[in-house]
Amino acid sequence: RNETLKREQPFVMSVPASEADPSYPEDETILVQGIIDAWFPEGDEIVLVDYKTDRVKEAGELKKRYEKQLAYYQQALERTTGKKVKEKIIYALALDEELVL
């Protein structure tokens, strides 16, 4: 299925500060940095995978907690690769379950 699995890819990108917190002025920017657990190209698009070790009762809780984080990961990958992220997957290790966002 995958062509090349990329792991632990660090990134730093500039985003409007108001995107992180609406109380910031529109013209200010902040740096967002992180490490993307895994991703792979699938055709002309990308599948993003994030592993979570949180102990939760259901995977849906992880969606609420990490939706914004994965949106930043998506933005970083799309900027650096020029490809569209077609799927974001959170893999809940404690539940042995995947959640597609």
Feature map (PLM): residue ranges:
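Structural signature of nuclease core domains in nucleic-acid processing machines
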Residues: 1-101
